[in-house]
Amino acid sequence: NIGAVKLTILFTIITVCNANAQQNNLSYAVAWKQTAAEHRALYYQGFNIARLHVEQALAAEEGKPLAIIADIDDTLLLANDYWGYLISNEEDFFNDTSWDLWVAENSFVPSPGSQEFLQFCANNNVEVFYITNRDQGDPTFELAQQNLNSAGFPMVDREHLTVLRETSNKEEVQRGIMEDY
């Protein structure tokens, strides 16, 4: 009987350890992003430094008008719920199909400090340009525009939003904007 009890306990320990070893690694990253003060602080720090640079450029009043060029996903808009969705569906890596469906649901939240920073820019006549390399087919532009508008960002129109569906390289568009700003 003692041998059977030891064997049962050993089997239980092995089963629990094996279950823990198979836990989705995304859960650690998502938990950190959703709860860590450092995560929020890093966003605020980045946008505060950017604001300082804009203030300095405004004070210098040199040459061309000023502009900000921003990426959208994980820069201005956070998709924490999407990563939670992957975990709950036992997926452990980004999935284009589920991402495309999720983008249309418009469940993004603005990153900490992003709205305030871009509103500061708009209030000070600094043009705000958005560039993304999303591809959700034909409605990609409208979806990106809807996501940004829902989050309350300024200057979200055809002149200020560029969607690159064929490439992830944003340099050519950035150079084009920098010719005028």
Please give the residue ranges for each predicted region.
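Bacterial N-terminal signal peptides
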Residues: 6-16
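Non-catalytic pre-domain segments flanking phosphatase-related domains
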Residues: 19-70
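C-terminal cap/substrate-recognition subdomain and adjoining C-terminal extension
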Residues: 22-23, 37, 135-181
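Second-shell loop/turn segments in exported
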Residues: 32-43, 100-108, 130-136, 161-165
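Active-site neighborhood of HAD-like aspartate-dependent phosphohydrolases
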Residues: 40, 58-67, 76-109
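Loop/turn elements at helix/coil->beta-strand transitions in domains of secreted/extracellular proteins
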Residues: 63-66, 122-129, 155-159, 181
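Solvent-exposed loop/turn segments at secondary-structure junctions
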Residues: 75-77, 83-84, 126-128, 133-138, ...
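Short, acidic loop-to-helix structural element flanking the phosphoryl-transfer center
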Residues: 96, 100-129, 136-137, 142
